[in-house]
Design a protein with these regions (language model features):
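C-terminal motif of bacterial Sec signal peptides marking the signal peptidase cleavage site
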Residues: 13-16
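Sec-dependent N-terminal signal peptides
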Residues: 6-11
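Bacterial N-terminal signal peptides that target proteins for export
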Residues: 1-5
Length: 212
């Protein structure tokens, strides 16, 4: 009997030593529910979310009709702003206005190229240089553009600031609309940048208007 008992104890000990322990269930649960810090949108604070929320919180990578229309319209909108800005060096009286016009041209030129490339990548039409801008907010009429080209000195400065302020306000309106109706994260970023940059430029132009 003693020999048999010793054999049983030895077998149990060997079995215990060779067993492969599984992962601690409590630790596995803790790892799967660890919180994640998600950055907020521009102007919004970061927030804590669960892993399950994180898996569904990725912005939609696809574009919808609102995104495409915004980019197509903004290409045309930006082109007119550049057409206005390139008149300033030879017609404006104010050095500050010439500097502002140069910054507008330098900012919106690359944005036109970015938007053109994005439309091509989406397989969408890029507006030509004679595209209609009927219904776009803030666009100068052909008559207003002719008047700007004919003006010089302080008369040019006044008309330029009036037209470009309205033009910027139109771009902000368009950007606000796509932030509500669009779905593509890159276009959301673009619209936020356009709205922020042009809001700051409107404030500067109003200061310049007050000094004329």
């Amino acid at each position: 009997m003693r020999v048999a008992l010793v054999a049983v104890v030895a077998a149990l000990s060997l079995s215990a030593c060779s067993a492969d322990p599984g992962p601690p269930p409590v630790q596995a649960k803790a790892e799967s529910t660890a919180p994640i810090i998600a950055p907020g949108r521009p102007g919004e604070p970061a927030r804590t979310i669960s892993p399950d929320e994180a898996r569904t919180a990725v912005p939609a990578p696809t574009a919808n009709a609102a995104d495409v229309k915004y980019v197509q319209d903004m290409v045309t909108h930006h082109r007119q702003a550049v057409d206005m800005a390139v008149l300033a060096p030879s017609r404006a009286d104010s050095a500050a206005l010439k500097g502002l016009a140069s910054r507008i041209k330098d900012a919106q030129g690359p944005e036109i190229q970015y938007m053109t490339t994005w439309l091509q990548q989406q397989g969408m039409k890029v507006p030509d240089h004679h595209a209609s801008h009927t219904g776009m907010p803030g666009m100068a009429t052909p008559e207003q553009m002719q008047a700007l080209k004919a003006a010089s000195g302080k008369d040019f400065d006044r008309l330029f600031l009036t037209l470009m302020t309205a033009h910027h306000q139109g771009a902000i309106t368009m950007s606000e609309q796509v932030l509500v109706g669009g779905s593509h994260i890159k276009i959301e970023e673009l619209a936020n940048d356009v709205a922020a940059t042009q809001s700051a430029e409107i404030r500067r132009m109003r200061e310049m208007q007050a000094g004329l």
